């Protein structure tokens, strides 16, 4: 499959490889975990920058919360409130091929959402930093799963 893909696309891939070879290793690998959805659009998918590369998943599954607070999943389809939109000049946007619309969307999964994914939606984190909270949630086991396992184990005869 890979050889056939290269043969069919080597013209533009060769140029693209030259373009990205100066990037960080973690940005050179692109993982498309969207079986059955080959539209190439990431705007309606969950995006996560990981040490191993950029991972894209359907929003029907959350990527694993990671011990590293810098790998928080991104929700690109969420429209930002106007006061949260970065203030870039037209020249800066043009330099990167972006429009005002492009920068009006996308935010990280919130601490509250991450806690809910682990079954800890009501948990209070005191005055821990967001990074420490994400790290703790990434190291946690889902509370609902623990309850199911505990019930099975305690009722075993």
Segments predicted by a language model, with ranges:
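C-terminal target-recognition/interaction regions appended to catalytic cores
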Residues: 1-157
